[in-house]
From Swiss-Prot:
Keyword ATP-binding: yes
Name this protein carries in UniProt: Probable protein kinase UbiB
Root EC class: transferase
Sequence similarity: Belongs to the ABC1 family. UbiB subfamily.
Name of the gene encoding the protein in the UniProt record: ubiB
Molecular function terms from GO: ATP binding; kinase activity
Database matches in InterPro entries: Kinase-like_dom_sf (IPR011009)
First-listed, main subcellular location of the protein, grouped into a coarse class: membrane
Length: 177
């Protein structure tokens, strides 16, 4: 549904010269769409809006017949080939693998902290909540890991959820009710 809304906003400007495009209206509609889907608008997007409005004004003065999409297509294709190349994916995977040991330690500490009662708090009467959380994490992890794109590095949140869910379900054997 979100994709269709974005397509509805953006398709009317494809293959139009710069003189026929209002970036102000385009960005306003994009922000309205984001709000409609309860998405937070990042400060960087406001800066992007300002930059695009400046480009629009300058472009209309210098070359109003410019077709941005035709002009930008070779640059965007080259950029995408570079970003999705095997070397770029390997570099991305390597960077994420370097973070995994820290992430695993932080996740374990957080899960163990959830399992221990807070200082001065009464001991939990029902540990079913942790089991339910474990089952939810396990199910979510399976869904995320199975729907991950071809880039294996993007699947780590699903695997992390899967591992956390398994930990919460298995740890009950060490700490029975």
């Amino acid at each position: 549904e979100f994709e269709a809304a974005i397509r509805t906003v953006c398709e009317p400007i494809f293959e139009k010269p710069l003189k026929d495009i209002s970036f102000g209206q385009l960005l306003l509609r994009l922000f309205q769409t984001a709000r409609r889907f309860n998405m937070e608008v990042q400060p960087q997007l406001v800066l992007l809006q300002k930059t695009l409005l400046n480009i629009e004004g300058l472009g209309r003065q210098l070359y109003p017949e410019l077709d941005l999409w035709t002009t930008a297509k070779p640059f965007l294709e080259r950029w995408m080939r570079k970003r999705m190349s095997p070397k770029a994916m390997l570099d991305n995977l390597q960077g994420q693998l370097e973070q995994l040991p820290h992430l695993a330690q932080m996740t374990r500490a957080a899960l163990e902290g959830m399992a221990r009662p807070a200082h001065g708090a009464p001991p939990p009467r029902d540990r079913h909540i942790l089991r339910l959380l474990g089952a939810a994490l396990l199910a979510g992890g399976v869904l995320l890991a199975s729907r991950a794109p071809l880039n294996v590095a993007d699947a780590w949140p699903g695997w992390l959820m899967l591992a956390s869910g398994l930990y919460l379900l298995v740890r009950r054997q060490r700490f029975p009710d």
